[in-house]
Design a protein with these regions (language model features):
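Structured, active/binding-site neighborhoods that engage oxygen-rich ligands
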Residues: 1-264
């Protein structure tokens, strides 16, 4: 989960100010956590406490305003009855990483990813995006190879992952939909040799930088099974006491597991 938060923070200055070279400053004074982190931690909190996803997502968004939430999501937060609004935006995928770390079977992961998405993003593509990211994290942390993950996600969700970042960048434009941003973020993980490398790959897409880096960072952390002290030392001080508490409690409970072989 820290990989997702690191990606969000690193990508935050570049969402509307794209980079052109991969050696851009990873963290700087303009970096901050955005809605990606807030809602990721809302999902983590819901899992830790056994609470409703929608309730926690709405509550956290109210208590942490002005973090870059979408307009339709903002209206959902303020509504008295909070009905899902048929979204296929990547908001469902950006917040789902805790699901991939917390649950122990493919069936549970896909079920919980759907539940975490459909309180807002009940469009099939919105649900698919959340499930694809959660499944990638589950597969990565249970020992699947990158090729196995590619084949599983392509087969299950119909995403075209047989592309290179170099080819994608030639024509890629800013896209906040699941179908137009999640596959590319997953490919950023495929071409990475570390969490930092995955985050840089995602930001260099020159798209929805914080969200795609959030997605790529979460998957890559699960794959390598480690998180550098340098990143931790930078990220945690940017979070308040409540958020630090959620991160530590969640990681203590769910992020210490050893990898096992993913069954076909």
């Amino acid at each position: 989960m820290l990989g997702a938060i690191a990606g969000d923070i690193a990508g935050s200055p570049y969402e509307f100010d794209p980079v052109t070279q991969k050696d851009f400053p990873m963290f700087g004074p303009s970096c901050r956590f955005t809605d990606d982190t807030v809602l990721t931690l809302a999902v983590a909190h819901a899992i830790l406490k056994g609470k409703d996803y929608g309730e926690c997502i709405g509550s956290f968004a109210i208590r942490y305003p002005n973090r870059g939430y979408g307009a339709r999501f903002g209206r959902w937060v303020k509504a008295w009855d909070r009905q899902p609004y048929d979204s296929y935006g990547n908001g469902s995928a950006m917040r789902v990483s805790p699901v991939g770390f917390a649950f122990n079977t493919e069936k549970e992961v896909l079920k919980e990813a759907k539940k975490s998405a459909e309180c807002t993003h009940n469009h099939p593509e919105g649900i698919k995006g959340a499930q694809a990211v959660a499944f990638a994290i589950y597969a990565a942390r249970t020992g699947a190879s990158k090729k196995d993950i590619e084949n599983e996600i392509s087969g299950r969700f119909g995403y075209d992952l047989d592309r290179t970042l170099a080819k994608i960048r030639r024509r890629y434009k800013f896209d906040e939909t699941c179908q137009g941003s999640v596959p590319e973020a997953i490919i950023a993980f495929f071409e990475a040799d570390s969490i930092e490398d995955a985050i840089r790959n995602a930001i260099l897409l020159r798209g929805d930088a914080d969200t795609q880096a959030c997605i790529a960072g979460g998957i890559t952390e699960a794959y390598f099974g480690t998180f550098s002290k340098n990143l931790t030392d930078y990220i945690l001080p940017l979070l308040n006491a409540e958020f630090q508490g959620i991160v530590k409690a969640f990681c203590k409970k769910y992020c210490h597991r050893q990898k096992t072989v993913l069954k076909a």
